Amino acid sequence: MQLLAIGINHTTAPVSLRERVAFPLEQIKPALGALRTHLAGRNGTEAAILSTCNRTEIYCATDILKPGAEGFEHTLRWLSQHHNVPASDLAPHLYSLPQSEAVRHAFRVASGLDSMVLGETQILGQLKDAVRTAGEAGSLGTYLNQLFQRTFAVAKEVRGQTEIGAHSVSMAAAAVRLAQRIFESVSTQRVLFIGAGEMIELCATHFAAQKPRQVVVANRTVERGEKLAEQLAEQGLTTQAIRLQELGERLHEFDIVVSCTASSLPIIGLGAVERAVKRRKHRPIMMVDLAVPRDVEPEVARLDDVFLYTVDDLGAVVREGNALRQAAVAQAEAIIESRVQNFMHWLETRSVVPVIRELQTAGESIRQAELERARRMLARGDDPEAVLEALSGALTRKFLHGPTHALNHMQGEDREALVRLVPGLFRQSSHSER
């Protein structure tokens, strides 16, 4: 069975390309079905898709594709067709990781070593969601199940035994730092949050600590926005929840806008921001777009009075704290390397399972036949001692027939290899019976 991880992330591609191959949550299950069909049929092929603002990754286990170029080209072709993105645009930015490299990558991703925010924990939850979705889609099997269960265990071990999460600057904290560079005080600003998911909740928590003048939450489902607004109000803030449709009329009211929705198209266009800036009499407005695909049209960045930041822009602020954790990174890498070797040993042992089953089936067939023969001998009154002698002798002869026949008929290097191997097999068998 071949393991393969193919992906694109914040280190290999800009957000302008990552957003073109992102998978909305509702599209992942049908995409998994299409991918498995593309990989030469569903039977025996396992797959999972991880899609976040910083990465899109496909994990596969298949005995159909060969490792290396064939698996890469096959999966690249599917990804290109599925998202209608030319393969020539994707290929330079994709990484293809077979076997142990795929295992190591999964362990590093879950442990936060491959994240823009080194040591962040959100990716572990996102990976668990991806595995749960793949399980519900019926695309997980023995190999990926084992890979991901060990991945979660390794992530727990890394976080428990190292300080990989210490000194971490989250994306949410980075957004606040940028706001503090633009405005003299966040406490005098009006803040708009668009969306009500986990990332917006994290951002809202960090901004709330700065006691902004007003916080408004805009969401497609107003009830969810109201819930977040109520939580912030409990911290003594002036809050309000509005519908997403009200954005056009109210955008000019806000000094800071933080957006992170699951929309596949921008929800804030250039024209809307131009009108807002005009109504603000050209007072500056800071916009943080944490969504992939992006919520704010990129052309907005050209406006003089708008400071627009994407997830890639926030990465520079985040990396300021990464150097402080290099000792923890070395510890984490050592743990991961050890666990990769353990998993690869398990994977290699899986290749002999069919042979073991075949041996067990053949042995059981011999046992049943000789046992039935012994019962017939006892039924006709034969001496039990003689029956046992005949039973044990027949079992010995039949079990040894295959190896002795091979030793007598093989030639050359094959025979020499068998001569070296067989005595060790029987010594092991003898020890195991004691």
From Swiss-Prot:
Substrate binds at residues 52-55, 115, 120-122, 126. GO terms for biological process: protoporphyrinogen IX biosynthetic process from glutamate. It comes from the Bacteria. Its EC number is 1.2.1.70. Keywords: NADP, Oxidoreductase, Porphyrin biosynthesis. During catalysis, the active site Cys acts as a nucleophile attacking the alpha-carbonyl group of tRNA-bound glutamate with the formation of a thioester intermediate between enzyme and glutamate, and the concomitant release of tRNA(Glu). The thioester intermediate is finally reduced by direct hydride transfer from NADPH, to form the product GSA. Catalyzes the NADPH-dependent reduction of glutamyl-tRNA(Glu) to glutamate 1-semialdehyde (GSA). This is Glutamyl-tRNA reductase. It comes from Cupriavidus pinatubonensis (strain JMP 134 / LMG 1197) (Cupriavidus necator (strain JMP 134)).
